[in-house]
Regions:
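Pocket-lining segment of extracytoplasmic ligand-binding domains
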Residues: 184, 188, 192-280
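Short, glycine-/small- and polar/acidic-enriched structural segments
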Residues: 30-188, 206-209, 225-230
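Conserved C-terminal helix/tail region of periplasmic/extracytoplasmic solute-binding proteins
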Residues: 315-351
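Bacterial N-terminal signal peptides that target proteins for export
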Residues: 1-11
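Secondary-structure end/capping motifs
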Residues: 246-324
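Bacterial signal peptide processing site
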Residues: 22-25
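Short, solvent-exposed loop/beta-turn-alpha elements that line the ligand-binding surface or hinge
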Residues: 72-78, 297-306, 329
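C-terminal motif of bacterial Sec signal peptides marking the signal peptidase cleavage site
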Residues: 15-20
């Protein structure tokens, strides 16, 4: 039975909001008699994998893998996937660096931050999940970038992928921002994303740089897309310690991720329904079809993490002062993924 808990966990000297927590699969063990994982076959003791993700459509592979029981199926009797739903990728980075979770579906910039803060020792990106699916949406009266001067824009959190993207874009347009909300355009990190939508609807902010479905909800509330944000939106990262200790279990996570991606490709309508059902179970409210459809269309779900996009994300974060100069060499470990892709007759990806 799926369990959802609400609470706050103290992590790394700060308060970390946990929006929800559950065990994946049809039982608290997260196991399934219909599958025997490589870890179980090798006689290893059952493992609990603590997995984080966000309640966003850009994290649909995670939502679907939970809803359809793919994690439970692939792990078999090897263990349990215990999921925690976070409000932002920044929170996920804090959790993974403090040992609260073992793996996470996360945006590229939080993954880069985890790599940089740990000196390249904390995490590895083992797969992609989604590209696209984020936009800068503004009120309809704004028709030029110059009109953003003196306005406020929301982002999910300081240093997350959409936060970096809008700051960099504004800098390219000659407008300044600051981490404290100053500058020509005040950037306002707002959690949860739904709060940013409400602030936009009430006129408290001029717009936001938000992932799906929240950018679509802003458009539905009268906004217009000023800029669609391309590139990698979601990757799957694991701690290096967990990968080293449990490579077979990580392989099972990758299988479940591919199961979800294959389902998205083979049955888009069924995949949308599954993702929306899991969103409803997590947030208490499903997305309206008028939001879900457009949100889905702006995302490409793929196992390719797009290394070039990740490098660009790092350079942009450095440019706006949110990241120290960092060497991303070694951040990827795509060998397990490529072995699975090869076995399925699919093209390999590169890091």
């Amino acid at each position: 039975m799926r369990r959802i808990l609400a609470g706050v966990a103290a992590v790394a000297g700060g308060a970390l909001l946990i929006a929800g927590c559950s065990s994946a699969g049809s039982s608290s063990s997260g196991s399934s008699s219909g599958s025997t994982s490589s870890a179980s076959a090798a006689g290893s003791a059952p493992v609990t994998v603590r997995l984080g993700y966000l309640a966003n459509i850009t994290h649909a592979p995670a939502l679907i893998a939970v809803k359809n029981g793919y994690f439970a199926k692939e792990l078999g009797s090897a263990g349990t996937v215990k999921t925690t739903v976070f409000s932002s990728g920044t929170q996920e980075t804090t959790a993974i660096l403090s040992g609260q979770i073992d793996a996470a579906y996360v945006g590229p910039n939080p993954a880069i931050n985890a790599w940089e803060k740990s000196g390249g020792t904390a995490i590895k990106i083992v797969s992609g999940a989604a590209t696209g699916g984020a936009s800068i949406v503004v009120k309809p009266s704004i028709s030029s970038v110059a009109q953003l001067k003196g306005q406020s824009l929301a982002t999910p959190s300081l240093g997350n992928t959409q936060d970096v993207a809008v700051r960099y874009w504004l800098k390219q347009q000659g407008l300044t921002t600051s981490t404290t909300g100053g500058g020509d355009v005040a950037i306002k990190p707002t959690t949860p994303n739904s709060a940013a939508v409400l602030e936009f609807k009430s006129g408290q902010i001029a717009g936001g740089s938000e992932p799906s479905p929240y950018d679509v909800e802003m458009v539905q509330d009268g906004g217009k897309v000023l800029l669609s944000e391309p590139g990698t939106t979601t990757v799957l990262m694991v701690t290096q310690s967990f990968l080293s200790a449990h490579p077979a279990v990580v392989n099972d996570l990758l299988k479940a991720n591919l199961d979800a991606l294959n389902y998205i490709k083979s049955d888009p309508s069924g995949a949308q329904a599954a993702a929306n059902a899991e969103l409803a179970a997590t947030t208490g409210k499903p997305l309206k079809s008028a939001v879900l459809g457009p949100a889905w269309k702006e995302i490409t779900f793929t196992a390719d993490p797009d290394a070039a996009s990740l490098n660009a994300d790092a350079q942009q974060a450095e440019s706006v002062g949110l990241l120290k100069t960092v060497d991303l060499s070694g951040i990827f470990d795509l060998t397990p993924l490529n072995n699975l892709l090869s076995a399925a007759g699919q093209s390999s990806v590169s890091g």
